[in-house]
């Protein structure tokens, strides 16, 4: 099963023209954390999920790939 969150965060970051480092700085995390999210190696907290959704102006459902 594919991790839609991992796919979506990577796609949104690339659409915004951001590097993993730049996104990490904007969200207040380290670059490795963003990398782990994008590879499905780490989940984020609910608070961070909301912060990411707000940053990209999407819903948490969209970020998680829930239809």
Feature annotation, model-predicted:
Residues 14, 25, 54:
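Alpha-helical residues within the helix-turn-helix
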Residues 9, 23-24, 34-37, 63:
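Conserved hydrophobic/aromatic packing and binding residues within compact polymer-binding modules
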Residues 47-62:
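DNA major-groove recognition helix of helix-turn-helix/homeodomain DNA-binding modules
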Residues 28-43:
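Recognition helix of helix-turn-helix/homeodomain-like DNA-binding domains
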């Amino acid at each position: 099963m594919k991790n839609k969150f991992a796919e979506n965060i990577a796609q949104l970051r690339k659409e915004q023209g951001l590097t993993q480092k730049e996104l990490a700085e904007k969200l207040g995390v380290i670059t490795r954390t963003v990398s782990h999210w994008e590879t499905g190696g780490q989940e984020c907290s609910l608070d961070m999920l909301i912060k990411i959704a707000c940053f990209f102006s999407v819903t948490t459902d969209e970020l998680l790939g829930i239809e």
